[in-house]
Amino acid sequence: MAKEAPAKTGLAVGLNKGHKTTARVVKPRVSRTKGHLSKRTAFVREVVKEVAGLAPYERRVIELLRNSKDKRARKLAKKRLGTFGRAKRKVDELQRVIAESRRAH
């Protein structure tokens, strides 16, 4: 992005010539918010997950994790989700679910 320009001097000559002005505070563009999760969306997803429970493949992944078959669990998640990054995130999330269920009991 452009650097902050030094303040104008109010003179007609020199590097910073021109009228003294106050800088406007510009709101960030809407296009900058793309991909950012809103509070409402996060809340709705949380409620849906709580009501609907886990998908069948998620239950299977949890079963594999409980039997310490981490690599197989990641491969299954990758097959269902498409990319390895998403699969790793999902497996980490499901491991947290297992840990929470252990703490609850």
From Swiss-Prot:
PROSITE patterns per the UniProt record, alphabetical: RIBOSOMAL_L36E
- Name the keywords, alphabetized: Ribonucleoprotein, Ribosomal protein
Gene Ontology biological-process entries: translation
Region of interest: Disordered? 1-20
Matching entries from Pfam families are given as: Ribosomal_L36e
Gene3D superfamilies reported for this sequence: 60S ribosomal protein L36
Tell me which family the UniProt entry assigns to this protein: Belongs to the eukaryotic ribosomal protein eL36 family.
| Name of this chain's protein | Large ribosomal subunit protein eL36
Q: Look up and give the organism this protein is from.
A: Trichoderma hamatum
List the top taxonomic levels of the source: Eukaryota, Fungi, Dikarya, Ascomycota, Pezizomycotina
Gene behind this protein = rpl36
